Every structure is written in C-alpha cells, then in structure tokens.
Amino acid sequence: LPICANGSTNCHQIPLDDLFERVVKLAHRIHSLTSDMFNEFDERYAQGRGFISRAINNCHTSSLTTPEDKEQAQKFHHDDLLRLVMKVLRSWNDPLLQLVSEVPQGIGEAPGTILWKVTEVEDQTKQLIEGMEKILGRMHPNGLDNEVLSLWPMPMAMHAGDGSKLFAFYNLLHCFRRDSFKIDSYLKLLRCRLFHEGGC
C-alpha cells in the first residue's frame, strides 16, 4: 500500500500521526518479508556451511552506531533516531538493487518465492524511504541534517565459486533482516514517543 495513495502531492493532507502509522506498518511488513526470505534461504542453501559464524559483524552498516535494544534507543533524541533510520534505509539502496538483479543469475534454481520477496522488499523499502522523507519534511520544513552515506563497498563477487556466491547472498539477507528489525523497532518507539501519551 503506497504511503500516499494519490501520489506524493497528497501527503500534506494526511495527519502526521497517520503518516507515521503507515510507515510503521510498512517497516513491519518489510521485516516480516525479510525474515521469511532469510529463513527460506538458510534452510534451502546454508545448512552445514557455517555461514552464520562468518556473517556475525560482517554487515556493511556495522560502522553506524545504532542502539541495540529499546533501553538504549530510549536515550536517543527523536531527531537522532529519525536521522539514523534514514541513514540505514538509504545504505540499503545499492545492495537491494543488486539482490534484485543478481538473484536469478547467482542462484539459478532459486524458488519463485525468494525472487518475489527480494523484489517486493526492494520496492517497499523505496516506499518507506519516500514516506520517511515526507515525515521529515513535515517535522522539519527547513531541513534536518541528514547526510547520505555510501556504505556499500563493492558489488558481490557473483562469478566466484558457488560457496562464495551463496555466502554473499546469505550475508546480505542476514544483515538486512538485522537492520530491518532495528528500523521496525525504532519507528515503533518514535510513534509511541511522539503521539502516544503515558510513556513507551
């Protein structure tokens, strides 16, 4: 479901709390899809290969300082959390584009469910970025310092051996599952903090 059903020009007519509700639902949907996709890939391709031990702390977004749990996130000002959500989201533009283009070639026998989910996640992440940009524009009409970082170091080595290709896919899915959970959690906390009285 698009953040702004009648196009971006209609966003100014939607209450800010409603916009926030929409991005929270979209972020949760993305995390759910990503978790399903990772679990399917893990079960089908990664069993017995020891990928998880190699994937820990091997994400291209690891250089970003992010709160690890709700208690840590509570210590962040809401503007800092908004900036962080945008940094993490934008850092996934290139990796998701490559996943969409490379999965059919890199995993020729990949089931249609994985191919569909990769495309769906990439499309919905674009929608989420658009929704967050609308929210930031409403909350900070004069702009919010939000530099765009290029954290994606290089394309995956798609012509390497099968094990290396599979690990490259596994690692990306593992990392996006981790980051999509953080985005989902931070947005739920922000919604609660900004619009719900009585504490979070």
UniProtKB/Swiss-Prot annotation:
GO MF, one annotated term: hormone activity
Record's GO cellular component terms: extracellular space
Summary of the tissues where the protein is detected: Pituitary gland.
Domain of life: Eukaryota
Sorted UniProt keywords: Disulfide bond, Hormone, Secreted
Pfam families reported in the protein's UniProt record: Hormone_1
Cellular compartments annotated: Secreted
InterPro entries linked: 4_helix_cytokine-like_core, Somatotropin/Prolactin, Somatotropin_CS
Disulphide bond pairs: C4-C11, C59-C175, C192-C200
Leader peptide range in chain numbering: none
Keyword Secreted: yes
GO biological process, alphabetically ordered: positive regulation of cell population proliferation; positive regulation of receptor signaling pathway via JAK-STAT; response to nutrient levels
Family matches, as Gene3D superfamilies: 1.20.1250.10
Keyword Disulfide bond: yes
Family in the record: Belongs to the somatotropin/prolactin family.
Protein name (record): Prolactin
